[in-house]
Amino acid sequence: MPSLRHLLTLLPLTLAAALAQAEDWPAPIKQIEAKGARILGKFDAPSGLTGYAAQYQNRGMALYLTADGNSVIAGNLYDAQGNDLSSAPLDKLVYAPMAKEIWAKMEKSSWIQDGDTNAPRIVYLFSDPNCPYCNMFWEQARPWVKAGKVQLRHIMVGIIREDSAAKSAALFAAKDPQKALETHEAAGKGSKLQGLDKIPADIEAKLDANMKLMEELELRATPAIFYRDDKGGLQQQQGAPAPDKLVKILGPK
């Protein structure tokens, strides 16, 4: 499973970047910015240093300006007990805003609801109609969904077989997409779902946008599952989870 921190850095932090660009950074920090880093904020640091959070080459990076303001040190800072003093500031200034942006992008994507709209927990997954592991996760999630505790949102794509996109289009085009998805998944290998012969332009645009988002996140397979942990942090699971991970993703039964 890819590192979530790596995943989060794949999307542009447009708002934070715009705000950061308005700052007049010290000369050494400007030099790092000139090399392609985005300076996203400043934080307190020990020993007379001043910390700066940056995004560089799809990674969060900590910068430390020396007390005289003439030099900058790049990298994580550790105390005498081996505690990483850079992790928390990077989480707050870099990774947390990126996680929020990813969640917002998934909210705006085209998905099929699976479960109660008032369910307290929402889980997104990129799903292909021909994906056996998507079907496995659908089955795994039934106790939570039927109890009204979880709403799955299936971001439909077409990557596994030649007819995958046409089948996703058929689900989107159904009079009741939620019911059509339930019928398809409940049938498993016996599904009678037929792909559309011709995909309407509006549905094709939805599928294209979903695929673009999947590519932005550098996801290679389905299901790619996104959920929030007990602290509200964004987490990802690639593939159908092991049974012992279900509670982390779906919450208590």
Identify what each model region corresponds to.
Residues L8-A16:
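Bacterial N-terminal signal peptides
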Residues E162-A174:
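Short Fe-S-cluster ligation motifs
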Residues A173-D197, A201-D202:
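Short, internal strand/loop/helix patches
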Residues A224-F226:
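Catalytic His-Asp charge-relay segment
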Residues M1-T9:
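Bacterial N-terminal signal peptides that target proteins for export
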Residues G233-Q235:
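Structural signal for short hydrophobic segments within the conserved structured cores
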Residues P2, Q21-S164, T183, K198-T222, ...:
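Extracytoplasmic thiol/disulfide redox context detector
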Residues L171, Q237-Q238:
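Short acidic-hydrophobic, aromatic-tinged amphipathic segments that line or gate anion-handling sites
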